[in-house]
Regions:
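Residues that mark the start of a beta-strand
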Residues: 1-3
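Glycine-rich adenosine-cofactor-binding loop
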Residues: 5-16
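NAD(P)-binding Rossmann-fold cofactor-contacting core
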Residues: 23-44
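Short, well-ordered alpha-helical microsegments
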Residues: 40, 75-76, 99-101
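Rossmann-fold NAD(P) dinucleotide-binding segment
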Residues: 53-65, 69, 73-94
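Rossmann-fold NAD(P)-binding glycine/threonine-rich loop
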Residues: 80, 93-113
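Anionic-ligand binding region
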Residues: 118
């Protein structure tokens, strides 16, 4: 089964975690990483069975699919690290892909997938 790691614990990241908690999201969440560790940990503490908080590097290592929910400015670095590890990326901030076409080339070269929800 595909496991997901979430980068970002704002409105979208929290919605995904809540969906997982009530069973609406059936893929296992291996962890979460965020630029705002303190607030992310505070939110995780409100969940009954929270995933582990971890560094972005740890998250990528233990997840099959990385879900970016942190804003477009993290996409270039996150995509690079994700694709270097041979993992796939779901970019919630799809506009960043237009601003950084090299990300598409990198995914192609590494045979990784980019999912862009609409």
């Amino acid at each position: 089964m595909t496991t997901i790691g979430i980068v970002g614990c704002g409105a979208i990241g929290q919605a995904l975690l809540k969906a997982s908690e009530v069973g609406s999201l059936t893929l296992p969440i291996t962890g979460i990483a965020s630029r705002t560790e303190e607030s992310a940990r505070a939110f995780l503490a409100t969940l009954n069975d929270p995933p582990e908080y971890c560094s972005q590097t740890e998250l990528i290592a233990k997840s099959d699919l990385i879900v970016e929910a942190a804003g477009g400015d993290v996409i270039p670095e996150l995509a690079y690290e994700t694709f270097q590890s041979g993992k796939d990326l779901m970019a919630i901030s799809v506009g960043a892909l237009i601003s950084h076409p090299e990300i598409l080339d990198m995914a192609r070269e590494r045979r990784c997938k980019i999912y862009a929800p609409s």
